[in-house]
Every structure is written in C-alpha cells, then in structure tokens.
Amino acid sequence: MITAQISHVAFLAARIILMILFLLSFLVTAFFVERLLFFRKRLLKDLSPLLSALELAQSKTEIRAVLENAGRSETALILKGLQETNATEASFRKTVQAFLYPERKQWERFSVFLGSVGNNAPFIGLLGTVLGILKSFADLSLVASGGPQVVMAGISEALIATAVGLLVAIPSVIFFNICKVYIKRSLNHVNALMDMIGAKNLF
C-alpha cells in the first residue's frame, strides 16, 4: 500500500516538474524576445557615427542637438548631464552616473531570471529523473513479472526530465550572455560619450 502511494506521488511530482520546465522554457523565450526588441529599439547599435558628429560640434547647443537626434537611452543619459547651464565636467559626470543607475536596472530586467533558470534548470530536471527512478523501483515491487524491463523502461522515461532540464538551461545561459553583451556595450557607449564631450573643454 505504501509502495503504491510512493509510486503515485513520484509519478505526479515528476509530471509537475516537467510542466514547470516547459513553463520555464516558454518564459525564457518570451523574456529574451522582449529584451532583444527592447535593446534594438532603445540602445545604440553603432557609436562611430555619433562620435563623428560630436567631434564636429563646437558648443553645448550643437552637442545637445546631435544627442537629441540620436534618440537612444545612452544619449538621453548624457542629455540629463548637460541640463545644467553652469555645470562643471565633474558635476556632468556625476549627474550621468546618478541617472545611469535606474536606467541600468531597466536594461538588466529579466537578466536575473534568465541566469537563475540557466543555473538551476538542470537540477530541476535531475530531481524529475530521481523521482522517475523512484517510481520505477516502486513499480518493480508491485509487479510480479517484468523484472529489469520494468525498471529500464521507467529509467528511460525518467531521463527525459534531465534532457528537458538541459534543453531549458542551455538557451537560458546563451540568452543571459547575449543580454550581458548588450548591457556592457551600452555602458561603454555612455563612458565613451562622456569622454568625448569632456575632451572638448566646453565646461
């Protein structure tokens, strides 16, 4: 009786784990697509044309016009630093850094989730496999005939959970790393823009 209950509970738990993994797979894909669209819409793709335009600017007014024309998150941060008419270069940089913190949180949205799924999905799949194996041995004690065939069939089915866990984890890690590349590139863009404007000695 207890063995039958163990088999039933292990079966249900293994199925729930597979459902969780499939749900995580859907969420990972949805969040990554959202992030990819966000990055392509809001962040600078190539900084070179903007730096060339800024190099030709001779005043803060011209710099603001160039930045406003770009219309990206990085340029919006620089514009906030240029709001004060009598700002020094030091205060300009501090203002940009202050506004960068909340902006960076927007850039990093869902990154923790993607990284966590990438790190933990294999273990969730492994748990499903352990439960599947537990069910197989419980079934073996309930079946009078069948012997090793019952166990092997159950183990083969249980290993699906590990495979699914890996199939969820690998794309999650790839997506997480892609997001990190976008964020790091944008941070470098902000620093490069500050350096370019600071080098013009307009403060």
Regions found by a protein language model. Name each.
Residues M1-L50:
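Hydrophobic membrane-targeting segments
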Residues S7-A14, Y101-G118, Q149-I160:
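Alpha-helical membrane-interface segments at transmembrane helix boundaries
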Residues A14, L27, V33-E34, G118-A121, ...:
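Residue-level micro-sites within transmembrane alpha helices that shape
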Residues I20-L27, A121-I124, G128-L131, L166:
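Residue-level signal for the membrane-embedded core of alpha-helical transmembrane segments
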Residues V28-F31, L37-F38, Q106, I160, ...:
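Hydrophobic side chains within alpha-helical segments
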Residues R42-G146, I174-F203:
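Predominantly long cytosolic amphipathic alpha-helical stalk/bundle segments
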Residues A158-I174:
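Hydrophobic alpha-helical transmembrane segments of polytopic membrane proteins
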